[in-house]
Amino acid sequence: MTIQYESEFRTRLLAGGAEQKLLDILLHRLKESGLLKTHRRQRTDSTHVLGAIRTLNRLETLGEGMRVALDSLAVVAPDWLATNIQPDWFDRYGRRVENYRLPKLDSEREALGSTIGADGLALLDAIYDPTAPQWLRQIPGVETLRQIWVQQFYAPEPDVQVKWRTVKDMPPSTIAIHSPHDVEAHYSSKRSIDWVGYKVHMTEICDEDSPRFITNVHTTLSTITDEQAVEPIHSRLEEKDFLPDEHLLDAGYPTAENLVNSKTQYNIEIIGPVRSDPSWQTKAQQGFDSSNFQIDWDNEKVTCPQGHQSTKWLLGLDVSEKPVIRVRFNGVTCRNCPVRSSCTKSKTEPRELTLLPQVQHIALQTRRQTQKTPEWKATYNQRAGIESTHSLMFTALGTTSISLHRFKENSLDAGFHCLCA
């Protein structure tokens, strides 16, 4: 089954958030009828959704970017384009740019890329000329062309041929444009799957005495991590008045911050495994990891397994700008320690620890212990059933092959497919 609907109608649906409203109405009707008796325990998992675009290489992206911009100008500013277009552009961009029509030799492909780059710069120079109408710059196809050229080429220099960026100077996947036909469809990789498109998180009830009703569909860019989706999902469930007591999630979702915030803000217990301590001691299963140190939070002191106290307690931020505490021990004491090799691999520096804020640290350490118990594992095993819902969406409704052209339309289509499920 594939959902099709006319463009203007689709626009009205998007503006009104119709897919969420319909799902909310359905859930409350099910509740009123007695079919939905409880939503105490729910589970969520994400899957990839392909964008409705061809996979383009760099040369195709450049050519298509130029073609889209020219096609847009031909519709909204035909007179202006007629006076600024170059004769060669009709041959180069008159039809879809496809790899089988492009040169095969690397030298010829590089030369064509430079030619397309020069064409794009000439068009942008004309559009940004003071005498050109300023509204031309707001045309989506033109802005997409500008962004692609910034990402693919170095800044132009006078009397120097336009130069492609090297791979190391290319933008990260979070902003890289892979097709001018959908600038929000980004490349992402998860486990063994690589795709260009989006991500959808489906939440369903998994209480033993309740049917498996889907309660929420949350669509994100493909580059948004699962852990970043936890708070928006809980916020949406709160708006629906469908918050669970327990939320079963796989290892991609739980973090110390999510464990704490979910409990304090929504009174939800996340049932999901947290990542193990990344230290070499934990990986080698020998030596002293952070769990072997005693922390005195009130006095801001840490005691090592040998009974020595830390000398520095510094507040800071990690690479994600999240608050952490950096603890350091005395250099002389550490260098003379008889079990130094079990504590640090540094030949001269003392042992250092990076701790999370107290509440998060305790929540993380507690979960690492409880997730080893048979009782916890038995509860968590119920999370696996969400994959059958994904299978239904894939095989029966074709979620991964919906015609998705923009992020909001992705959300709309995924929401309606959820209702059909």
Role assignments for model-derived ranges:
Residues I3-A421:
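Anion-binding and metal-coordination hotspots
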